[in-house]
Amino acid sequence: SETRCKKYLKELFVPMAEYFISKGMYVVMRPPGVCPHAGDTEDNRYLGIELGDSYQEFLLKVWDIVSQNAVVKNNPGIMFELANEPVHIKGTDGKYGGDGDACFINMQKYFQAIVDKIRGNACNNIIWVPGLGWQSQYSGYKDHRIEGGDIGFAVHC
C-alpha cells in the first residue's frame, strides 16, 4: 500500500541509507519482490509484464513516492534499480519473451515511463534499468534506448 511504502521509507529505508552513506558506502534502492513471471504464482496467472499492467502501475507509484522523498531525492549516495529479474515482457508481436526486438520495443516504453516519472519529480539520482531475461539481455537497448541522463544497466553476471 502507499501508506506502508511511505511509512517504511521514512522509518526504515531512509535511516538505513543515511547510516551506510555516513560510512562511505553507496546504496541501491529497489522495489520489493521480482517482476511477475510464469511460475510466480500457484495459479500461474502471470506470463510476464506488459505495458500498462498492474506491476507497471505499482512501479510508477513506488518510484513516485521514493523520488519525492527529501532525503533520497538527488542524494549522490543513493541510486535506483527500477526492477528485479526475471524480466519477460509481452512484445509488440503479442508474445511474452526475454529477448528480441519485439520485446525491447515494449521494454523501452515500459521503463521509459518510470524514468520519466522520476525525472518529472526533478529527481536526478542514478537509475539502473533492468535487462530482459535474468537481467542478462541488453542488446536491444542499442536500438530502443532509454532516454535521459545518469542511466545505467543493472547487469547480473
Q: Which residues does each PLM region occupy?
A:
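Extracellular glycoside hydrolase catalytic/binding regions
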Residues: 47-79, 83-157
